[in-house]
């Protein structure tokens, strides 16, 4: 199938680009960091190890996936390879979804690799939930990176947009708490700021509820809560894919 061919090409590019070696190096570095923390921690050394390493691997996975996807699609556009691919008897929808499936598969493989070292400090069910959530989160980041990589003309703006979107989604609950602080004096400006923040929050995915470090520390979340998190990520991913397809169909490359 043509789509399967595009998936294989994306995975082959990730392998030839050294993504596997980069992942291995990052895992080794994170394990070394955990060993260092075990020596300096006075109490709760195991909890400190899993919390720091889990947060580090999650952040690294997101930004590695984003940079890989954007660099790949920008290279195809700049080298005119994407134009050559569009000349083939494949619809733009097949072209877009095939690439996205390949990038998402790379993100899922990276997430699985990053979850494995956490088995040294956390229970297997908790690591499994964390890894599944990270896989969905990085797949969503891959969709965002592909959208911004095609929409924006250069690597830096596309990466900045993807990173900014991700960080804003992660930090939005904190921003909402600050905006709704009871210590602030009531005023029309304060009400407008709170309303604006809440409106922006409605447009963003609930990444703050995904891939939580406390899952590794205190056990897996409830089934309904976990399913709600995954459904939110997948639902927002569908919206990003729809926006990407719309832009890709109207764009002249």
Language-model features: locations:
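Secretory targeting signals
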Residues: 28-72, 96-158, 177, 223
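Aromatic- and glycine-rich beta-strand/loop motifs that create alpha-glucan
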Residues: 1-24
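Central hydrophobic cores of alpha-helical transmembrane segments
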Residues: 24-28, 157-169
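Helix-loop-helix units of permease transmembrane domains in multi-pass membrane transporters
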Residues: 71-102
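Membrane-interface capping segments at transmembrane-helix boundaries
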Residues: 17, 245-253
